[in-house]
């Protein structure tokens, strides 16, 4: 073999290892989707902390390579770096750690000052159970239907936790769908809120809540943990970490731990979770008709949850005196997209009355929605395991 043939043969062999030789149309479509997510995050400011890691993860997971090369670089190849990171998703480690961070950052004062707001968070879970029934009717297995339905809670970590236990084969699609709808809260919810409320209802001013003592704030995570986990023990990994994080925050003696859980630890886990979830949406498994059905059911669940919260506030107002009526615009905050949904309530309220600040009122049902979605996930897990 002369030098020219040797170079040509080895160059041809080299080309077989490149992405150019192994790329499919599906890979290119998913890479474009990943780039679109990054564009939405940076250009349109749609939840950049979520969409940048997920978008880059989608691109990373769809860069093609020779599967028989034994390079140990793919997400699903044992001992690869990405596979090690992915175990946090697959085994369900990341969601409880994120709930720890959420608990350490969350102020439950608005909920404690006006406990009836918890009912709004509970009512928003109708979206989950409504979508579950529709998913069953569409031919999904009960375990798959549960994983899809939890998207209605607009809670990415809960969706990942439940789908990793009940429907791991759909986890990538469910996770991306859940985080996509979390990022699209400012697009989806305002239309539903305007549709279901009158101008008179939108300008209702709510009285400030009472002052909550430190003792109440300390007792809440302890009592909340006991009540929720005694009712739904299968929700312990999420609820336990949520209330643990909140106790660290409210005790006044573990400020350093609460700060670490709510900042550095939470940021690291969110980065790894977003990246690996994005990587898991590989074209060969993601571009299917089932994925389209999952996104459609997820949208339906999220819209039902939003509408349920708004309508439930209107129902509550029928039984409340004029001085204690609630603004229905806080009903959308019953989903657990914290604090995005509460910000939408506030922004829409200011649009109709620039002196009507609803943010703190909306945070009550918003944090109740976090608890509600975790309880709903625990109930589905316990029922279907």
Language model regions located:
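N-terminal alpha-helical transmembrane segments of multi-pass membrane transport
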Residues: 1-77
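Interfacial helix-loop-helix linkers and transmembrane-helix boundary segments
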Residues: 42-51, 84-85, 105-120, 254-262, ...
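Alpha-helical transmembrane segments
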Residues: 169-187, 295-305, 330-333
């Amino acid at each position: 073999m002369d030098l020219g043939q040797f170079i040509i043969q080895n160059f041809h062999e080299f080309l077989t290892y490149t992405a150019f030789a192994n790329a499919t149309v599906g890979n290119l479509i998913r890479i474009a989707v990943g780039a679109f997510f990054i564009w939405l995050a940076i250009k349109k400011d749609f939840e950049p902390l979520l969409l940048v890691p997920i978008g880059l993860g989608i691109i990373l997971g769809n860069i093609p390579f020779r599967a028989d090369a034994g390079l140990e670089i793919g997400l699903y190849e044992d001992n690869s770096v990405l596979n090690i990171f992915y175990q946090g998703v697959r085994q369900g480690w990341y969601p409880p750690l994120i709930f720890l961070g959420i608990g350490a950052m969350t102020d439950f004062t608005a909920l404690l000052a006006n406990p009836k707001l918890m009912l709004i968070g509970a009512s928003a879970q109708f979206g989950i159970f409504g979508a579950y029934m529709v998913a069953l009717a569409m031919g999904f297995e009960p375990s798959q239907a549960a994983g899809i339905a939890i998207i209605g809670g607009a809670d990415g970590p809960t969706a990942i936790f439940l789908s990793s236990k009940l429907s791991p084969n759909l986890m990538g699609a469910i996770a991306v769908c859940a985080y996509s709808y979390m990022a699209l809260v400012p697009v989806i919810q305002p239309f539903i809120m305007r549709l279901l409320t009158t101008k008179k209802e939108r300008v209702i001013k709510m009285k400030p809540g009472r002052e909550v003592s430190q003792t109440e704030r300390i007792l809440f995570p302890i009592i909340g943990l006991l009540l929720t986990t005694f009712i739904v023990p299968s929700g312990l990994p999420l609820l336990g970490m949520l209330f643990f994080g909140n106790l660290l925050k409210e005790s006044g003696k573990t400020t350093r731990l609460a700060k670490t859980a709510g900042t550095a630890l939470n940021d690291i886990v969110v980065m790894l979770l977003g990246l690996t979830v994005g990587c898991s949406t590989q074209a060969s498994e993601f571009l299917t008709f089932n994925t389209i059905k999952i996104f459609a059911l997820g949208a339906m669940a999220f819209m039902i949850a939003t509408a349920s919260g708004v309508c439930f506030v209107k129902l509550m107002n029928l039984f409340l005196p004029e001085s204690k009526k609630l603004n229905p615009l806080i009903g959308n905050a019953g989903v657990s997209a914290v604090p995005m949904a509460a910000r939408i309530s506030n922004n829409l309220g200011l649009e109709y009355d620039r002196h009507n600040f609803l943010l703190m009122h909306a945070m009550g049902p918003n944090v109740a929605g976090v608890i509600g979605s975790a309880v709903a996930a625990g109930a589905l897990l316990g029922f279907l395991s």
